[in-house]
Regions:
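S-adenosyl-L-methionine-dependent methyltransferase catalytic core, i.e., the SAM/SAH-binding region
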Residues: 1-314
């Protein structure tokens, strides 16, 4: 991939896939010294645009073809935009030759994806239970709800949805699907209401729909597998920044960054170091950076965002 300078940014109106980027200036600050940046989750191109404005060479990738089209409309020729999953970035020869000194991941689902009922991420009435990031990603949410064993359903609602009645909800889904296959959002909403009671509402639906989405897309496993590869692609002294929105995602990022920063890889109870290990770098953010109250007021979906960064050893 040839080296090219940042070109003028397009000034046209917003695209249909309009999305408000979270922690925009905080990301720009963490990556301010980077000259070659890989945006691993392009979305509508908001972060990439801000980084390109600062003079960086930006390559933006996304697994979602709708996001790729939106990012291209936003960025024009100011950045290179490709359809590629960040989990596959380490195996891509063009990205390896780029040798980025900055990498950004903004995890989760963007507002346009949530708001597009046809994508199946929403609990709006009649929305299809799809939730896949791309059409060839594997089983839909409906297929997973109809086929997964009760134990798998319960584990997903407990681990990804922090649901105390996860097993009861799993049993209710199994009971209902025996006579009526899950197909649209109403089917899952009604099962949730049957278990959580009449006081259940949008916050519960959002939390449990998110759990299904995470399970269907294998998001936590994908993140855990991708991080070591991205560190390998990152040039020495470079910064890897990750924005997470779910406690499970944040735990993975926090744990991995801490492990990378350890000088010794021996078991904790081993009294003498025998590995002669060397830390892979340092954690830049001792605590996660969170949105300001003003940002949350302007964009409520930013409320759960957590930003962490790691600098690779020189």
């Amino acid at each position: 991939m040839g080296d090219k300078g940042a070109r003028p940014l397009p000034s046209g109106g917003p695209s249909v896939f309009e999305h408000r980027s979270v922690l925009l200036e905080e990301v720009a600050g963490l990556l301010s010294g980077c000259r070659r940046i890989l945006d691993g989750t392009a979305g509508a191109g908001g972060h990439a645009r801000r980084l390109a404005e600062a003079g960086a060479l930006v390559v933006a990738i996304d697994r979602d073809p709708d996001a790729v089209r939106a990012a291209r409309a936003t960025l024009g020729e100011s950045a290179t935009v490709r359809q590629l999953d960040f989990a596959d970035a380490a195996r891509d020869s063009d990205l390896s030759s780029l040798a980025p000194d900055g990498i950004l991941l903004d995890l989760g689902v963007s507002s346009p994806q949530i708001d597009d009922a046809s994508r199946g991420f929403t609990f709006r009435p009649g929305a299809p239970l799809d939730m896949r990031m791309t059409a060839d990603d594997g089983p839909t949410a409906a297929q997973w709800l109809n086929d997964a064993p009760a134990a798998e359903l319960g584990a997903a609602f407990a681990d990804f949805g922090d649901e105390p009645r996860a097993r009861a909800l799993a049993r209710e889904i199994v009971r209902r699907r025996a006579s009526h296959a899950f197909a649209v959002s109403d089917d899952l909403v009604n099962a949730i209401r049957a278990v959580l009671g009449p006081r259940s509402g949008p916050a519960d639906f959002a939390r449990l729909f998110q759990a299904v989405r995470i399970a269907v897309n294998g998001e936590l496993d994908r993140l855990a597998r991708a991080l070591p590869g991205l560190l390998g692609v990152l040039s020495s002294g470079g910064v890897l920044a990750v924005i997470s929105y779910h406690s499970g995602e944040d735990r993975i990022v926090k744990h991995v960054f801490r492990e990378w920063a350890r000088d010794c890889g021996c078991p904790p109870r081993q009294p003498v170091c025998t590995c002669r290990g060397r830390a892979l770098g340092t954690v830049v953010t001792k605590r996660a950076i969170v949105p300001t109250p003003d940002e949350v007021a302007a964009n409520p979906r930013a409320r759960s965002a957590r930003l962490r960064a790691f600098r690779k050893a020189a």
